[in-house]
Amino acid sequence: MFSQKIKCKVFADLHQQDDVFLIPNPWDIGSAKVLQGLGFKALATTSSGLAYTLGRADGEVTLEEKLFHCSELAANTTIPINADFENGFADDPETVAHNVLKVANTGIAGCSIEDFSRDALSLYDLDRKSVV
């Protein structure tokens, strides 16, 4: 099993290469293993895919469920995983930062934070985004 440190290095290197790389979205361990077997260099979680496998709409997955999902994918693959971490499961930058530390501890190599508020379904203002 590759360490998280190695996966993070591989993921950073992918972003520095001259060529583009595709990063498909597995929704469970099985699809992650298939995509890894097809030769993809990295994977990214899908918030909607996870929600649908749980019989819910996109945006209805809890932080705890997302953390478990990320840890399962990271533990069952040897390539970097980037987490679709929605809005960081919080509206304030401090809680987002705390939650990013939690997801980092699952073994993933990176995460993406969206710039929208779940309640208002609108974009955060620029001042708030720049703090994060």
Go through each PLM region and give its residues.
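N-terminal amphipathic alpha-helix/helix-capping segment at the start of soluble metabolic enzymes
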Residues: M1-N25, I29-G37
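Conserved, mostly hydrophobic/aromatic
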Residues: D28, L35, L73, D84, ...
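Catalytic cores of alpha/beta
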Residues: S31-V34, F89-K102
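Conserved small/polar residues in nucleotide/adenosyl-binding loops
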Residues: V131-V132
